[in-house]
From Swiss-Prot:
The lineage of its organism: Bacteria, Pseudomonadati, Pseudomonadota, Alphaproteobacteria, Hyphomicrobiales. The gene is recR. GO terms for molecular function: DNA binding; zinc ion binding. May play a role in DNA repair. It seems to be involved in an RecBC-independent recombinational process of DNA repair. It may act with RecF and RecO. A zinc finger (C4-type) spans 60-75. Belongs to the RecR family. InterPro entries: DNA_Rcmb_RecR, Rcmb_RecR, Rcmb_RecR_Znf, TOPRIM_dom, TOPRIM_RecR. One of its GO terms (biological process) is DNA recombination. CDD domains: TOPRIM_recR. This is Recombination protein RecR.
Length: 201
């Protein structure tokens, strides 16, 4: 076992940073050193922001987004299209779509995808709440913005069947060639999806 090179408080900081996705032990040490070097301008404000976040962050009971208010900022935004619900796997997907500016609708965060391998069943997700929302007056379209994985496709089919009685339009994101992509570098599955979802030019 490697010997500790600093006091327990610094070692704890390194260990906690190392739990972050994409940060291994070496990256965690580098991040900790940067925080320590910039104690006044970075470490103290970050610690304060994290304390406030831990106290105030809540999950929106309507859509599943995280915010400091319930309902969340997006659900309270009256400029959004109330006829469309965009279904995403996780909050990170919601944030990605918001950054793109491509859609100005309401969202529904499932909290994951169905997975027989991982034992994730419909009751582990917010599918029942989605069905309730799909039945609300004025809702006309459900956009399935789920990842193009086997579990994502399984979840999309399950959701589609669950909301079928409402007679809503159900669409999903197009799959295929990314903007700026070269065909030679794409895998066969992506090329097949691109051919099948081709559109008029």
């Amino acid at each position: 076992m490697p010997q500790a090179v600093a006091g327990p408080e610094i070692e704890r900081l390194i260990q906690l940073l190392g739990r972050m996705p994409g940060l291994g032990p070496r990256s965690a040490r580098r991040a900790a050193l940067q925080l320590i070097k910039k104690r006044e301008t970075l470490l103290a404000p970050l610690a304060d922001a994290m304390r406030v976040a831990a106290e105030r962050i809540v999950v929106c009971r309507s859509c599943g987004n995280v915010d400091t208010s319930d309902p969340c900022t997006i659900c309270r935004d009256e400029t959004r299209d109330p006829t469309t619900l965009v279904v995403v796997e996780d909050v990170s997907d919601l944030w990605a779509l918001e950054r793109s500016g491509a859609v100005k609708a309401r969202y529904h965060v499932l909290g994951g995808v169905l997975s027989a391998l991982d034992g994730v069943r419909p009751e582990h997700l917010t599918i029942a709440r989605l069905v309730e929302r799909a039945g609300e007056p004025g809702v006309k379209e459900i956009i399935l913005a789920l990842n193009a994985t086997v579990d994502g496709q399984t979840t999309a089919h399950y959701v589609t069947e669950s909301i079928k009685p409402f007679g809503l339009t159900v669409t999903r994101l197009a799959h295929g060639v990314p903007v700026g992509g070269e065909l030679d570098y794409l895998d066969e599955g992506t090329l097949t999806a691109a051919i099948r979802s081709r559109t008029a030019f």
